[in-house]
């Protein structure tokens, strides 16, 4: 399969203005073709952008990214898997986001054609997000308790149950017909 790798180093990826403020990018980006299946793989390895003010040695602002994304598609299904971490640091405060998500669409009403509307099918979701800082932490989990049933004529879901669980409780949304859904909050 085809692939491309971009490597960023401080020696080659630093820009400094006349006031001594610097932008630095380091890390690696790899994108590749998975082969016979339509799609891509994207990998970020410690890709970090930093802003240094007035010649300081510690960054004022820094965004670091690490993780993987994979998309696959056939005429019968689409699959997206992603697992990544982002960290944003502003002065001494750091906020992180960790994401692990899998989404699958299986066609039931005909083939999936690039550039055309999705046919009838089912959608499943399973994922976790964690956002944390030195002061707070929030966790969210998404899951399809029953696959979401997509109807092309409706342009939306006509069946299925999606559950979102977070700190303090969960929300369950149930679709029963085109444009008809109910959401219920269940406290911990």
Predicted features along the sequence, with ranges:
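Low-complexity, intrinsically disordered segments exposed to solvent
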Residues: 1-188
């Amino acid at each position: 399969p085809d692939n491309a790798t971009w490597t960023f180093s401080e020696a080659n990826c630093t820009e400094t203005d006349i006031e001594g403020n610097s932008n630095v990018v380091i890390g690696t980006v790899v994108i590749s073709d998975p082969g016979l299946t339509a799609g891509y793989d994207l990998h970020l390895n410690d890709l970090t952008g930093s802003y240094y003010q007035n010649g300081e040695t510690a960054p004022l602002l820094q965004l670091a990214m690490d993780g993987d994304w994979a998309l696959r598609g056939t005429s019968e299904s689409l699959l997206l898997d992603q697992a990544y971490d982002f960290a944003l640091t502003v002065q001494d405060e750091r906020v992180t986001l960790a994401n692990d998500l899998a989404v699958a669409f299986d066609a039931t009403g005909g083939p999936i054609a690039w550039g055309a509307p999705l046919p009838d099918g089912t959608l499943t979701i399973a994922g976790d997000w964690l956002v944390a800082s030195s002061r707070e932490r929030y966790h969210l989990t998404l899951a399809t308790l029953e696959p979401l049933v997509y109807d092309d004529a409706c342009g939306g879901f006509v069946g299925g149950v999606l559950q979102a669980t977070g700190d303090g409780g969960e929300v369950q949304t149930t679709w029963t017909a085109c444009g008809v859904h109910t959401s219920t909050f269940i406290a911990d």
